[in-house]
Amino acid sequence: METAALEFGSAGYEHASLNRIIEQCAMSKSSFYYILSSKAELYEFVLQELIAEVAAEIDVVAPEHFAGTEFWSKVERYFANLISVSQREHSFLLLGRMFYLQAPDPVKTAVATTLGAVREWVHEVLRVGRRCGAVRTDLPEPLQAELVFAILQVFDEWTIAHYADFSASALQNLAVAQFATIRRTLAP
């Protein structure tokens, strides 16, 4: 699986070579095609496996966990924990690289489903923050939810694309600055 994820992540979906993947896995083509019938099926399989690995490493808390006067400190701790786990677990980077590939729509079902769930969770956390007075209410809630999700995606995609350019401490500093940007955008 890691071989395929590395191939997709480095070459992109269109240029990823099944022959290279099969060769690096020391499989015969007939064995590979007995298990999976196409590049699209392999891509979906790898995505599903990486999503499961990442999900097993994250404690997704109920949005109500953030309610109250400690909203921002709770969100900051949660964000810091996500960053820490993502730097420790290589599967996060592999998944991130595959998430942002240009791939045909039919093979992006797992990405769309996962992003939809994350988008809804972020919206619910935002709603909790608005209710407890920690998040500004001068923008319509749906617009604000789209804005914060777009910012998070830009941060994620950019960080993944430039991951190798940073030391571990520089990545940590970047994460702190990214969180501060979100807080400045949302706090009253």
Please state what every model-predicted region is.
Residues S10-E14, E89, C132:
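Short coil/turn segments at alpha/beta junctions that flank glycine-rich nucleotide-binding fingerprints
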Residues A4-F8, L82:
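Short hydrophobic clusters on alpha-helical segments that form packing/core surfaces
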Residues M1-E2, E14-H15, I35-D59, E76-A80, ...:
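An amphipathic alpha-helix adjacent to DNA-recognition modules
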Residues E7-E41, F45:
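Helix-turn-helix
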Residues L93-L94, K108, A112, R130-F179:
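Hydrophobic/aromatic-rich alpha-helical bundle segments in the mid-to-C-terminal region
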Residues I83-H123, L143:
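Short secondary-structure transition hinges
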Residues V46, L50, V54, I58, ...:
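Hydrophobic recognition helices of helix-based DNA-binding modules
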Residues F45, D59-R88, E141-V148, A175:
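Hydrophobic alpha-helical connector segments
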